[in-house]
Amino acid sequence: MTARLRPELAGLPVYVPGKTVPGAIKLASNETVFGPLPSVRAAIDRATDTVNRYPDNGCVQLKAALARHLGPDFAPEHVAVGCGSVSLCQQLVQVTASVGDEVVFGWRSFELYPPQVRVAGAIPIQVPLTDHTFDLYAMLAAVTDRTRLIFVCNPNNPTSTVVGPDALARFVEAVPAHILIAIDEAYVEYIRDGMRPDSLGLVRAHNNVVVLRTFSKAYGLAGLRIGYAIGHPDVITALDKVYVPFTVSSIGQAAAIASLDAADELLARTDTVVAERARVSAELRAAGFTLPPSQANFVWLPLGSRTQDFVEQAADARIVVRPYGTDGVRVTVAAPEENDAFLRFARRWRSDQ
């Protein structure tokens, strides 16, 4: 006889991360190609001296550093820290949604939203995208008296698009004040062209807005799992109540603080990624691909029924990309030589179609 598990888990998929294949070019996980700065490495080395001790469960120094980084309108009480922003997504579901409640988000979007909602016994309301972008009008129309939480993934993963600052502000104004709006900004550092929203201003103006950010992408600490939320102190207190103790390591906290100290240098690296993004996008379009304008560190190829063939042939060429069913393929913008190899493959594949 096996243990009796919750029956609703039977229908949940197991998360499948981007593959790592020895010797292959990995363009599947939106990782930065830049390693930690020397100052961050030094902080990591120092932190190893105390790994026999539990980490600071309250992340006191990191929260203080984040508050300083965010500006004078924010205090540590406005900040929650988690084991990556994905953990904070789950915590937000936990503190807002009960059995039968609804959580609204565009689809396709971050693939862990649906299972996180279902594990809570709540109902995911997946609103189709328009032109690969969140349709905020349709999302607003999907709000009911059972809606407890709305996710706006901006830039959207995996389609790379953003909703404009004005449209996002109007949406926030229109959502009832008792519904929490989570603006998931894992890739916000890559937004250009005047499309970056004043999300922190929305937090200041609306008690029901929380912003999620991460050190995994632009800051290059994906392996240390550090994310944070910015919101009203009542929301932050609720997140802290469901935080699993000690899940943010002492090494991660030290690395994050050192990264904030070097933020200007680290964020300057995003200009290199953005330049490569423009080059890769232009060359893909010149080769005959259709793709939306990216504001992230990846591009989206809506290949439909040809998705699996593209992925398999890329693997044969020792290039690993990320498929999303029969919707399309997400491709990380990587180092120039890696991007060149991908572009050579993409042109060959396109010429055979």
Swiss-Prot record:
PROSITE patterns: AA_TRANSFER_CLASS_2. One of its GO terms (biological process) is L-histidine biosynthetic process. CDD domains: AAT_like (cd00609). The modification N6-(pyridoxal phosphate)lysine is found at K217. It catalyses: an aromatic L-alpha-amino acid + 2-oxoglutarate = an aromatic oxo-acid + L-glutamate. Its cofactor is pyridoxal 5'-phosphate. Its EC number is 2.6.1.57. It is an enzyme of class 2 (transferase). GO terms for molecular function: aromatic-amino-acid transaminase activity; histidinol-phosphate transaminase activity; pyridoxal phosphate binding. Keywords: Aminotransferase, Pyridoxal phosphate, Transferase. Aminotransferase that catalyzes the conversion of aromatic amino acids and 2-oxoglutarate into corresponding aromatic oxo acids and L-glutamate. Belongs to the class-II pyridoxal-phosphate-dependent aminotransferase family. Homodimer. This is Aromatic amino acid aminotransferase. The lineage of its organism: Bacteria, Bacillati, Actinomycetota, Actinomycetes, Mycobacteriales. The gene is pat.
